[in-house]
């Protein structure tokens, strides 16, 4: 089974997360996409609502979208959510699966700063979402990692891990910070949030009086 992995704090989950994942699923013909909320994200000090609420919102999205599932492996962990550790655990649990780890171009350009980042290439394929027309600098140091591993979406993979796909996805001008700020001001950003997420946030009175300084 070909499974896309989309991790994040999802604080809250919004169309800026969902729509690129749908495009990746279609372009790479994935069987499923797993939404994986972080419990303790390594690059952020905290989240704004509980892990339970963020899991519940991800579950609402998966309930509405066929082939979207929630993976709670990081949510159950009481230590920072390092991707290499998570993918190693997933490969152990699901050795028959072929994992595609989805990230934005900004994350990919900083991947060499990640914990044991080189292990990722033995555990999964990397999918990098970029804006149409955006080009990676030919002199960027990441090119030494990218060039021998890059594949087009239409090309077959070399085994179950180790390839990198750079995919054009439609630009989504949405950030969790902006969504939280609007919610704190009493506005419901209906263009950014599925109706079920809007209802959940209102019913549970989330994002009221919290700081909204972190990004996605």
Curated annotation (Swiss-Prot):
Family annotation (CDD domains): NMNAT
Gene3D superfamilies, per the entry: HUPs
Single GO BP term: NAD biosynthetic process
A Pfam family of this chain: CTP_transf_like
Disulphide linkage map: none
Pathway membership, UniProt: Cofactor biosynthesis; NAD(+) biosynthesis; deamido-NAD(+) from nicotinate D-ribonucleotide: step 1/1
UniProt cross-references to InterPro entries, sorted A to Z: Cyt_trans-like, NadD/NMNAT, Rossmann-like_a/b/a_fold
Catalysed transformations (reactions): nicotinate beta-D-ribonucleotide + ATP + H(+) = deamido-NAD(+) + diphosphate
Protein's name in the database: Probable nicotinate-nucleotide adenylyltransferase
């Amino acid at each position: 089974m070909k499974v896309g992995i989309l991790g994040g704090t999802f604080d809250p989950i919004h169309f800026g997360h969902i729509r690129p994942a749908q495009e990746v699923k279609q372009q790479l013909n994935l069987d499923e996409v797993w939404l994986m909320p972080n419990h303790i994200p390594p690059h952020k000090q905290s989240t704004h609502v509980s892990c339970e609420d963020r899991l519940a919102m991800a579950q609402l999205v998966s309930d509405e979208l066929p082939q979207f599932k929630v993976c709670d492996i990081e949510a159950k962990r009481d230590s920072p959510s390092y991707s290499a550790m998570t993918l190693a655990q997933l490969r152990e649990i699901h050795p028959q699966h072929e994992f595609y780890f989805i990230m934005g171009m900004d994350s990919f350009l900083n991947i060499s700063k990640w914990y044991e980042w080189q292990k990722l290439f033995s555990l999964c394929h990397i999918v990098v979402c970029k804006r149409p027309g955006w080009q990676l600098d030919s002199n960027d140091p990441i090119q030494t990692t990218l060039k021998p591993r890059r594949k087009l979406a239409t090309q077959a993979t070399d085994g179950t891990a180790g390839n990198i796909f750079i995919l054009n996805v439609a630009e989504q001008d949405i950030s969790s910070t902006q969504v939280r700020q609007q919610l704190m001001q009493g506005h419901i950003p209906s263009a950014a949030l599925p109706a079920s997420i809007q209802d959940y946030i209102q019913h549970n009175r989330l994002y009221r009086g919290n700081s909204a300084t972190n990004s996605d």
